[in-house]
Amino acid sequence: MSEPDAYVKSLVTEIVPFIEKNYRAIPKKSSRAIAGLSMGGGHTTRATILYPDVFDYICPLSCGIQDSPQLDEQLQGIKKAGYKLYWVGCGTDDFAWPGTEVLDKALERNGMEHTIYASDGGHVWFNRRLYLNTFARLLFK
């Protein structure tokens, strides 16, 4: 049986250090972004909830979350740690759209500045290219 959140833990404790050791990356929160689409968007939200001191730029794409009693507390951890960008993209016909609305309401409820980029269409590559082209221009400003 695997450990819950093992992938997210590996991403933060193994992959980020590997990149910063082997590439010309600046090893600090203000120089790190995380983005993912679909399940990767779920990993993005989970990584920032579990490790709020690691990434300043948070961009989950085409993913939804479920509301839970712990969600506000988890988002408050991100708010307390600080972040520079919380940008969420999802198509209004995407099956993940209802979960994106949950995230939007939770971020609003917790007083967290964020952008919800609602595009036409569903869970399709065209939208992901649009999101990447849009949010990438906002990184590291």
What are these regions (language model features)?
Residues 1-141:
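Non-catalytic cap/lid and distal C-terminal segments of serine-dependent acyl enzymes
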